[in-house]
Amino acid sequence: MKTAHEIRPGNVIMLDGSPWVVQKTETTRSGRNAAIVKLKLKNLLLNSGTETTFKGEDKLEDIILDRLDCTYSYFADPMFVFMDAEYNQYDVEAENLGDAAAYIVDGMEETCQVTFYDGKAISVEMPTTIVREVIYTEPSARGDTSGKVMKPATITGGGTVTVADFVKVGDKIEIDTRTGEFKKRV
Protein backbone atom coordinates (compact mmCIF):
# COMPACT_ATOMS: atom_id res chain seq x y z
CA MET A 1 0.00 0.00 0.00
CA LYS A 2 1.21 3.46 -0.88
CA THR A 3 -0.18 6.83 0.04
CA ALA A 4 -1.62 8.87 -2.83
CA HIS A 5 1.29 11.34 -2.81
CA GLU A 6 3.78 8.44 -3.24
CA ILE A 7 2.13 7.31 -6.48
CA ARG A 8 4.07 8.18 -9.65
CA PRO A 9 3.32 7.94 -13.39
CA GLY A 10 3.82 4.36 -14.56
CA ASN A 11 2.63 2.82 -11.27
CA VAL A 12 -0.30 0.42 -11.48
CA ILE A 13 -2.97 0.65 -8.78
CA MET A 14 -6.01 -1.48 -8.00
CA LEU A 15 -9.19 0.60 -7.95
CA ASP A 16 -12.75 -0.78 -7.90
CA GLY A 17 -11.42 -4.28 -8.66
CA SER A 18 -9.55 -3.29 -11.84
CA PRO A 19 -5.90 -2.48 -12.53
CA TRP A 20 -5.29 1.14 -13.55
CA VAL A 21 -2.00 2.56 -14.82
CA VAL A 22 -1.16 6.07 -13.60
CA GLN A 23 -0.44 8.32 -16.58
CA LYS A 24 -0.09 11.66 -14.80
CA THR A 25 -0.07 12.97 -11.23
CA GLU A 26 -0.65 16.49 -9.97
CA THR A 27 -0.30 17.43 -6.30
CA THR A 28 -1.88 20.59 -4.93
CA ARG A 29 -1.09 21.91 -1.48
CA SER A 30 -2.96 24.75 0.15
CA GLY A 31 -2.23 26.60 3.40
CA ARG A 32 -3.86 24.60 6.17
CA ASN A 33 -5.46 21.85 4.15
CA ALA A 34 -3.82 18.53 3.38
CA ALA A 35 -2.39 17.83 -0.06
CA ILE A 36 -4.80 16.88 -2.83
CA VAL A 37 -3.52 14.45 -5.46
CA LYS A 38 -5.16 14.38 -8.90
CA LEU A 39 -4.45 11.23 -10.92
CA LYS A 40 -5.01 10.62 -14.62
CA LEU A 41 -5.65 6.87 -14.94
CA LYS A 42 -6.09 4.32 -17.73
CA ASN A 43 -8.00 1.08 -17.08
CA LEU A 44 -5.89 -1.81 -18.39
CA LEU A 45 -8.86 -4.16 -18.79
CA LEU A 46 -11.29 -1.80 -20.53
CA ASN A 47 -8.77 0.56 -22.19
CA SER A 48 -10.70 3.57 -20.86
CA GLY A 49 -9.41 6.60 -19.01
CA THR A 50 -10.50 8.80 -16.13
CA GLU A 51 -9.26 11.44 -13.74
CA THR A 52 -9.80 11.11 -10.01
CA THR A 53 -8.79 12.96 -6.85
CA PHE A 54 -7.46 11.64 -3.54
CA LYS A 55 -6.28 13.16 -0.29
CA GLY A 56 -2.50 12.93 0.02
CA GLU A 57 -2.67 10.45 2.91
CA ASP A 58 -5.24 8.11 1.27
CA LYS A 59 -3.90 4.56 0.93
CA LEU A 60 -3.92 3.01 -2.54
CA GLU A 61 -3.13 -0.60 -3.40
CA ASP A 62 -0.22 -0.67 -5.81
CA ILE A 63 0.31 -3.83 -7.83
CA ILE A 64 3.13 -5.15 -9.94
CA LEU A 65 2.14 -6.63 -13.28
CA ASP A 66 4.19 -9.13 -15.24
CA ARG A 67 5.66 -7.74 -18.45
CA LEU A 68 7.32 -9.73 -21.18
CA ASP A 69 9.24 -8.67 -24.29
CA CYS A 70 7.50 -10.10 -27.36
CA THR A 71 7.40 -9.65 -31.11
CA TYR A 72 4.27 -9.32 -33.22
CA SER A 73 3.41 -12.58 -34.96
CA TYR A 74 0.06 -12.27 -36.76
CA PHE A 75 -3.53 -11.00 -36.59
CA ALA A 76 -6.40 -13.45 -36.03
CA ASP A 77 -9.54 -11.30 -35.90
CA PRO A 78 -10.17 -9.90 -33.23
CA MET A 79 -6.83 -10.88 -31.65
CA PHE A 80 -3.28 -9.72 -32.21
CA VAL A 81 -0.88 -12.59 -31.50
CA PHE A 82 2.55 -11.93 -29.99
CA MET A 83 5.40 -14.40 -29.43
CA ASP A 84 8.13 -14.41 -26.77
CA ALA A 85 11.72 -15.69 -27.08
CA GLU A 86 10.62 -19.25 -26.14
CA TYR A 87 7.99 -19.25 -28.95
CA ASN A 88 5.03 -19.03 -26.54
CA GLN A 89 2.11 -17.18 -28.13
CA TYR A 90 -0.09 -14.63 -26.38
CA ASP A 91 -3.40 -13.26 -27.69
CA VAL A 92 -4.28 -9.62 -27.04
CA GLU A 93 -7.71 -8.29 -27.99
CA ALA A 94 -7.61 -5.56 -30.63
CA GLU A 95 -9.67 -3.19 -28.47
CA ASN A 96 -7.04 -3.41 -25.70
CA LEU A 97 -4.33 -2.06 -28.00
CA GLY A 98 -5.88 1.38 -28.42
CA ASP A 99 -3.68 3.67 -30.55
CA ALA A 100 -0.89 1.07 -30.73
CA ALA A 101 -2.88 -0.96 -33.28
CA ALA A 102 -2.11 1.62 -35.98
CA TYR A 103 1.63 0.99 -35.58
CA ILE A 104 1.54 -2.81 -35.75
CA VAL A 105 2.44 -4.21 -39.18
CA ASP A 106 3.36 -7.64 -40.54
CA GLY A 107 7.09 -8.25 -40.40
CA MET A 108 7.78 -5.52 -37.84
CA GLU A 109 11.11 -5.97 -36.10
CA GLU A 110 10.47 -3.84 -33.01
CA THR A 111 9.98 -5.62 -29.69
CA CYS A 112 6.83 -4.79 -27.70
CA GLN A 113 6.12 -5.28 -24.00
CA VAL A 114 3.06 -7.42 -23.32
CA THR A 115 1.47 -6.82 -19.90
CA PHE A 116 -0.22 -9.66 -18.02
CA TYR A 117 -2.88 -9.57 -15.29
CA ASP A 118 -4.08 -12.82 -13.68
CA GLY A 119 -2.14 -14.79 -16.31
CA LYS A 120 -3.92 -13.09 -19.22
CA ALA A 121 -2.27 -10.73 -21.72
CA ILE A 122 -4.18 -7.46 -21.34
CA SER A 123 -2.17 -4.77 -23.10
CA VAL A 124 0.80 -4.04 -25.32
CA GLU A 125 3.29 -1.22 -24.95
CA MET A 126 5.03 -0.21 -28.15
CA PRO A 127 8.66 0.95 -28.21
CA THR A 128 9.04 4.70 -27.66
CA THR A 129 9.91 5.33 -31.30
CA ILE A 130 9.25 3.31 -34.44
CA VAL A 131 10.09 3.70 -38.12
CA ARG A 132 7.31 3.35 -40.70
CA GLU A 133 6.97 4.07 -44.42
CA VAL A 134 4.67 6.78 -45.74
CA ILE A 135 2.19 5.15 -48.14
CA TYR A 136 0.13 8.27 -48.94
CA THR A 137 0.47 12.02 -48.54
CA GLU A 138 -0.36 15.06 -50.63
CA PRO A 139 2.50 16.60 -52.62
CA SER A 140 4.14 19.63 -50.98
CA ALA A 141 2.70 23.02 -51.76
CA ARG A 142 5.16 25.20 -53.67
CA GLY A 143 5.97 28.53 -52.05
CA ASP A 144 4.18 27.73 -48.78
CA THR A 145 7.26 28.09 -46.58
CA SER A 146 6.17 30.57 -43.93
CA GLY A 147 6.61 28.85 -40.59
CA LYS A 148 6.45 25.14 -39.95
CA VAL A 149 4.24 23.62 -42.64
CA MET A 150 2.68 20.25 -41.75
CA LYS A 151 0.39 17.85 -43.62
CA PRO A 152 -1.31 14.50 -42.90
CA ALA A 153 0.32 11.26 -44.07
CA THR A 154 -0.86 7.65 -44.00
CA ILE A 155 1.76 5.13 -42.83
CA THR A 156 2.07 1.37 -43.21
CA GLY A 157 -0.40 -0.13 -40.77
CA GLY A 158 -3.06 2.42 -41.71
CA GLY A 159 -2.34 5.08 -39.08
CA THR A 160 -2.30 8.78 -39.88
CA VAL A 161 0.51 11.06 -38.72
CA THR A 162 1.03 14.79 -39.23
CA VAL A 163 4.39 15.19 -40.99
CA ALA A 164 6.58 18.02 -42.25
CA ASP A 165 5.82 19.35 -45.72
CA PHE A 166 9.02 17.89 -47.26
CA VAL A 167 7.98 14.26 -46.53
CA LYS A 168 6.79 12.35 -49.61
CA VAL A 169 5.37 8.90 -50.42
CA GLY A 170 7.98 6.17 -49.89
CA ASP A 171 9.92 8.06 -47.20
CA LYS A 172 10.60 6.28 -43.93
CA ILE A 173 9.79 8.39 -40.88
CA GLU A 174 10.39 8.06 -37.15
CA ILE A 175 7.28 8.37 -34.95
CA ASP A 176 6.96 8.83 -31.18
CA THR A 177 4.38 6.17 -30.21
CA ARG A 178 3.46 7.90 -26.93
CA THR A 179 2.24 11.05 -28.67
CA GLY A 180 1.80 9.93 -32.28
CA GLU A 181 4.06 12.77 -33.44
CA PHE A 182 6.43 12.78 -36.41
CA LYS A 183 10.04 13.05 -35.21
CA LYS A 184 12.19 12.99 -38.34
CA ARG A 185 12.71 11.49 -41.77
CA VAL A 186 15.03 8.48 -41.68
Swiss-Prot record:
| SMART domains linked | EFP, Elong-fact-P_C
Report one GO cellular component: cytoplasm
Entry keyword set: Cytoplasm, Elongation factor, Protein biosynthesis
Q: Does the keyword Kinase apply?
A: no
Which compartments does it reside in? Cytoplasm
Q: Which GO terms describe its biological process?
A: peptide biosynthetic process
**Location, primary (coarse class):** cytoplasm
What GO molecular function terms would the record report? translation elongation factor activity
Which segments does the entry list as coiled coil?
A: none
**CDD domains in UniProt:** S1_EF-P_repeat_1, S1_EF-P_repeat_2
> Sorted alphabetically, which NCBIfam families does this protein's record hold?
efp, PRK00529.1
Family the entry assigns: Belongs to the elongation factor P family.
Q: What is this protein called?
A: Elongation factor P
Name the source organism.
Shewanella baltica (strain OS185)
- Name the lineage: Bacteria, Pseudomonadati, Pseudomonadota, Gammaproteobacteria, Alteromonadales
Gene this protein is translated from: efp
